[in-house]
Structure formats: C-alpha cells, structure tokens
Amino acid sequence: MDEGLDSFFEESQKSGPRNIRATAEMVWALEAVPGVEHLMAYESRLNYFIENKPWISICLYNLTKFDGATIMQVLRTHPYTISKGVITENPFYQNPDIWLKENAPQFLK
C-alpha cells in the first residue's frame, strides 16, 4: 500500500503542487476479499501517509450494512467524520501509533 500511494502522490506532483481528493465506497469490505481482515490496519496507517500532504480521503461506510463493532473500529481509525453533511473532529479517533500498537502491532511504522 505505502509504495503504491507514494508513487501515485509523487507522480501527481511532478507538474506542480496538486491537491488530492479520494473517496472510497467501503461496502466491498463485506465480501471475502483476500486481506480484508487487515482493513482497519490499512485505514489506520493511511493517517501516516496523508499527514502533511495536500490529500483528503473520504471513506464511505454504510451504517446500515456494517455491524456496530466494525463501525467503532472505523471511528477509531478516522480523525474526522461527516454526518448529515457536517464535518466534525472525531472524539473516538486514536493516533495510529496507539491503535496499531493495540490492534495490529505487525503494521506499526
């Protein structure tokens, strides 16, 4: 993940500074896709990647499709939430150093 995103970002900046906006509909994660068991580690690590970059990602988790335990993990790995069109700082967010240490230490930076 890290190398692919780094490469994409570097390529996007070659002709001058560019802001990056990305969205991801996450319903695919409900399927038995190889590696999906590491999704929250990826989500947490993404915070390392986008730090200090002109990059905004919006992960779209359908609250009617994901169970409560998964949504709580989502909240712990995302610094902001959007609900009813309002962006707010997420009080449940955990810094990746903390979240990864407690939940997926093999993915620590």
Each language-model region and where it sits:
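Non-catalytic regulatory/interaction regions at protein termini and inter-domain linkers
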Residues: 1-109
